[in-house]
């Protein structure tokens, strides 16, 4: 949220801001959305914010977001998706339905188990984001 009086407009993908895997995934989603259709997206379809940031905290205080910080969360005006469901919904939102469909074709128990395993060991396997490695400074896309 750029200023405290600005409303937070959905959809927003909340991610672990310290996780190198999550950070890289957000960079990739930003790039894929911009390259969708071989031209920059005229109207961005997805915004991003860290789970431990000001935007997430404001929504938690309003009861809009769960209190935990173990899974990526896609917050929209209709629903809140978590974990592997949020990943699939984010891919569809940026115009990558084939990739979302491929992900969705995995059996649900396997998809959930794979997500939980990766989420549990993400810092050990992929590391943490160095302090001097911010996402692009685009307040319309990347929220605090």
Regions found by a protein language model. Give the residues of each.
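Local sequence-structure signature of Cys/Sec-based thiol-disulfide redox active-site neighborhoods
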Residues: 2-37
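A short helix-to-beta-strand connector/capping loop
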Residues: 42-45
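Thiol/selenol-based redox catalytic cores and closely related redox-interacting motifs
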Residues: 51-144
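N-terminal cationic amphipathic segment used for targeting or macromolecule association
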Residues: 1, 39-40, 54
